[in-house]
Amino acid sequence: MTQLASSYDPKSFETDLYEAWEKAGHFKPSGTGEPYTILLPPPNVTGTLHMGHAFQQTLMDALVRYHRMRGYDTLWQVGTDHAGIATEMVVSRNLALEGKGETRDSLGREGFIGKVWEWKQQSGDTIERQMRRLGTSADWSRSTFTMDPQPSAAVNEAFVRWYEQGLIYRGQRLVNWDPVLKTAISDLEVESAEEDGFLWSIAYTLDEGLSYEHVERDADGVETLRETRDYLVVATTRPETLLGDTAVMVHPEDKRYAHLIGKSVVLPLTGRRVPVIADDYVDRAFGTGVVKVTPAHDFNDYEVGVRHSLPMINLFTPVAALNENAPERFQGLDRYAARKAVLAELEDLGILVETKAHKLQVPRGDRTGQVIEPYLTDQWFVKMDDLAKRGLELVEDGSISFVPPNWINTYRHWMNNIQDWCISRQLWWGHRIPAWFDEATGSCYVGRSEEEVRAKHNLGSDVVLNQESDVLETWFSSQLWPFSTLGWPNEQAMAERGFDRYLPSSVLITGFDIIFFWVARMIMATDNLVGKIPFKDVYFTGLIRDGQGQKMSKSKGNVLDPLDIIDGITIDDLVAKRTGGLMQPKMVEKIEKATRKEFPDGIAAHGADALRFTIAALATHGRDIKFDMNRAEGYKNFCNKLWNASRFALMNTEGAAFTGVPRPRTDAERWILARLAATTAEAQGHFAAYRFDLLAQCLYEFAWNAFCDWFLELSKPALNGADAADAESTRHTLLYVLEALLRLLHPLTPFITEQLWQQLAPRLGLAETTLSLRPYPTAAEFEGDFAQAEADVEWLKAVISAVRRVRSELNVAPSKLVPLRLQAGLEQDRVRIERFSASLSFLLKLDSIQWLAEGESAPPAAAAIVGELKLLVPLEGLVDLDAERVRLDKEIARVEAEKEKSETKLAKFTDKVPPAVVEQERVRLADWNTQLAGLREQRAKL
């Protein structure tokens, strides 16, 4: 075994340790014990590891390692998603950069898909390599790609079954259409933002010589206009769509227009007659109370159109130019050119009543930035009503638990307002829909293969069948992830991969932003297709933001690459990474300036453990999580402190060979074992509640404060003392507690704990070859009758802290011996002083400890109070009296402030506060009063 390095350098061992773990097969399921399964939300195969991935994967890995150490049969199922649209865009962009003139369309379907597979082979494992660097202990031999044969077979099976159940149908519906990508996209891929626009008011002439009395009133209800009109005024932000209007509507209870319901208006620029209909959707108080209805180009109008059986006129081509349904003079115009032409004609006709500035929500595709068009096309859909009803039941009856539970309300709202799901996409990369059309008749057949279709429907070789060209949207295959990865529907594969053993999984860790698009659909699909729940718990994480609370994005130039935090990056490389390939070149200078200001020296290497511990510490149950680099620096220091503490332990136990549980001889040993038992119980509770932030906090406090700051100090008198038995016992306890601490920390910080444990294990006679196979600590391992020792050592700590504070404030050199005089106090204080005199003398550098006799005057001294006990450090030869007066005044002010806080807290307590809490605060207040009296008395003497 090589000697532990003198300084903490994570780069020197993290990669080697990971390779050793993986080579030894430690990440594979053991096949014994209770199963514990986690599904990785499959990242896009196009992607690289970002902070959101690192955040979720750290928490998943902590749970997997924790349960593996507890003897569970752990399976962490990983893989990647084919990411239809994103992948097509990346490959198309790469083709353009190659400069060979090849495009998606010039290559054709098969040629382009071949290029996609080539690209996938080159870069598809990038994100998995990055996950390894983070320390994820997944079973890589089971890694699955959603386009692999097995999950592809599952996709076909699910489609066919749902089609046969009547859940999948083909029909015309409105979808979100991206005119650049020329495909439908999901709601998740649409980003709406407020933009400046216009609201145009247009006169629609009433048919058949109809008229009505139009009245306008001001805010006070005073009539300002009364006239007879033979036209209705409608307002729109999209005047070009009036060419596709099939009605105008009013509220059924609007008396102004009651006699016009069922009549017609003449549609401007077309001469078509469209009806005046009544619908509750209309807001009578907005504008004139008359609304145009364009069912093929507005989602709300579509619903109105369905209710009233209105014609649906699609005006646009797939690239958002006007098609043959528009008047000939507008055909072929881009939608924005058509808008200008329509407005010009309306103005020439004198029926453009008003134009005014208007704020409106504009939906844009998240990948192209283009305005999304509500578009009427033939698409494949899944009927959602019955699936959603069952999906909601499984959460509301507790079969599946949400953490935090408030997300149930969001889930319920969506499930109660669900729409049929458009599952087809006009792409080439993805799972091609298993449907075939008869070239002669247009009849559609669905089956697992063309051969199955022909056999089932008795179609001879003379019948020409063409497969549907559309592919399924990515979420269709993703919803099958819980069971397609376990071999479904192939029975042999299901048996080999442990379908019955590992489904349902134990917990899903994912972002709340895909609760509808993925979580809900997995619940519905798993229940319907295999009769199980997909997972028992869902833990929703917040979204990672930068230190100022801003969303991390390439365009903002504030993205942090987790690998840069782990391995470090120079400032020039960081600037290049943040500014390269920006869609808005004008942002380059601004981003470079901000980056150089925030990271003047680049980002130092922190190691994987420091990043992982930072993530755990930040993992609150809130919606947003601010990532603060200062926290990462702090936890790097934590790792460094743990390293140095381990070096201390190893240097003081050279040649040691212990076995079993130590039998503590000193109070310091008993105290640290009691703290260890309490910390272990607390840690297990936090794991069970998914409170990673509190877990990190309690382990940090034990490691830094209890173990490093106090136990190592308190062990020094025994290690350096004359009592050989005390020294030997302390050495055993030192190693024993450190080994337990490494086990406690291992799920969060696997690398440093493994590296240190390898040095420690031989001295404790441990048989395991790796820390990852050691059992996670239980509180019962460390419990004992240590209550008195705990109280005694807490008193000792208070005395040491008080005297050290005095020495520090007096600027007494650390090596200088000083006397300590004691006054007042209880009998218990005298017993403890006697008991701990050697430790006090050693740790406080005291040349003498003496009690003042009752009634004896105290010399001029710096004073501190612990309970009833007054601690006096005589000032003669140490300090001038003026400085001590200043010090005492500051100490009195501090204690007065604490006393006031305690009094305020007691005054605010209500009847609902537990009596024990009230009593605890009263005791605290009494202690402050005692300290204050002693300090004032000492000040009076000076």
UniProtKB/Swiss-Prot annotation:
InterPro entries: aa-tRNA-synth_I_CS, aa-tRNA-synth_Ia, Anticodon_Ia_Val, M/V/L/I-tRNA-synth_anticd-bd, Rossmann-like_a/b/a_fold, tRNA-bd_arm, tRNAsynth_Ia_anticodon-bd, Val-tRNA_synth_C_sf. GO terms for molecular function: aminoacyl-tRNA deacylase activity; ATP binding; valine-tRNA ligase activity. It comes from the Bacteria. Pfam families: Anticodon_1, tRNA-synt_1, Val_tRNA-synt_C. Keywords: Aminoacyl-tRNA synthetase, ATP-binding, Coiled coil, Cytoplasm, Ligase, Nucleotide-binding, Protein biosynthesis. GO terms for biological process: valyl-tRNA aminoacylation. GO terms for cellular component: cytosol. Gene3D superfamilies: HUPs, Isoleucyl-tRNA Synthetase, Domain 1, Valyl-tRNA synthetase, C-terminal domain, Valyl/Leucyl/Isoleucyl-tRNA synthetase, editing domain. It is an enzyme of class 6 (ligase). ATP binds at residue 554. It is found in: Cytoplasm. SUPFAM superfamilies: Anticodon-binding domain of a subclass of class I aminoacyl-tRNA synthetases, Nucleotidylyl transferase, tRNA-binding arm, ValRS/IleRS/LeuRS editing domain. It catalyses: tRNA(Val) + L-valine + ATP = L-valyl-tRNA(Val) + AMP + diphosphate. CDD domains: Anticodon_Ia_Val, ValRS_core. Residues 876-942 form a coiled coil. A motif ('HIGH' region) lies at residues 43-53. The keyword Nucleotide-binding applies. A motif ('KMSKS' region) lies at residues 551-555. Its EC number is 6.1.1.9. Catalyzes the attachment of valine to tRNA(Val). As ValRS can inadvertently accommodate and process structurally similar amino acids such as threonine, to avoid such errors, it has a 'posttransfer' editing activity that hydrolyzes mischarged Thr-tRNA(Val) in a tRNA-dependent manner. Monomer. ValRS has two distinct active sites: one for aminoacylation and one for editing. The misactivated threonine is translocated from the active site to the editing site. The C-terminal coiled-coil domain is crucial for aminoacylation activity. Belongs to the class-I aminoacyl-tRNA synthetase family. ValS type 1 subfamily. This is Valine--tRNA ligase. The gene is valS.
